[in-house]
A protein has these predicted regions:
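Catalytic-core "active-site belt" of small-molecule-metabolizing enzymes
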Residues: 1-179, 185, 192-234
Length: 234
């Protein structure tokens, strides 16, 4: 499949086509795995099954990649997660975008891999070359907000030093998928929430902030539950 981006290189921008043949979403990617296990137990208390091991990796249908500003979902219990996204052309050429692993939390309690397929993988239409941010990678900041009933709720925030670096993430994916990672999209997994639990709102917004180069990638989309037919979903 082909995705279209604007590649921002220093102060220049140019159109870029990115061909990809597979997409994966990582999870539980904290560099401190003791803290990750605490988070796993919190999720278990909410009814979400514990993974057999961490970090985790899930295959995702390529067609779910989306830059849409509006998504339709089934039911009211879906929410986004801010993540960095690696676009791997080959081992020498990798780009970074910003994404949201939007997930059906009702289905997640039953079947996590299938929960990853039912909602889109949102992504920015702008990307950066990885080599332009690699040296100061840990200083980059992920943030997200949920807009619920007209109120903006600060939802997530954390420096990228908290989760696996691109090199660590690619090494992890290589340990699960044999062969080169050419034409692969990797969603990184996310940072912690500032709220006590999931917030199900009408809009999700996120930023990847580069304080050194004074720039950011920004993502925002509206969430519309299907309402024209009642099928008994929560």
């Amino acid at each position: 499949m082909i995705a279209h981006f604007t590649l921002q290189e220093d102060e220049k921008s140019r159109p870029m086509q990115f061909e990809y043949t597979r997409m994966v979403n990582a999870g539980f990617v904290g560099r401190n795995q003791d803290e990750v296990q605490k988070h796993v137990q919190e999720l278990v208390a909410k009814g979400i099954p514990a993974p057999a091991e961490t970090p985790t990796l899930y295959p995702v249908l390529c067609r779910t990649l989306s830059t849409d500003a509006n998504i339709e979902v089934l039911g009211s219990k879906t929410s986004g997660e801010v993540e960095y996204v690696l676009l791997i052309e080959n081992e020498h050429t990798v780009y970074v975008a910003l994404g949201s692993d939007h997930t059906d939390r009702h289905l997640e309690e039953v079947d996590i891999p299938r929960a990853k397929q039912i909602c889109p993988n949102l992504i920015t239409s702008t990307a950066w070359p990885l080599d332009q941010v690699q040296e100061h990678w840990d200083e980059l900041i992920l943030k997200s907000q949920v807009i619920k009933d007209g109120q903006t709720i600060e939802y997530q925030e954390g420096k990228l030093e908290l989760i696996l670096s691109p090199t660590q993430l690619m090494d992890f994916v290589r340990s699960k998928i044999p062969g080169p990672l050419d034409k692969t999209i990797i969603y990184s997994g996310t940072v912690g929430m500032k709220t006590e639990g999931f917030v199900f709102g009408q809009r999700f917004a996120a930023q990847l902030i580069d304080p050194k180069l004074n720039r950011s990638l920004e993502l925002a989309y509206d969430i519309e539950p299907l309402s024209y037919l009642d099928v008994g979903q929560g």
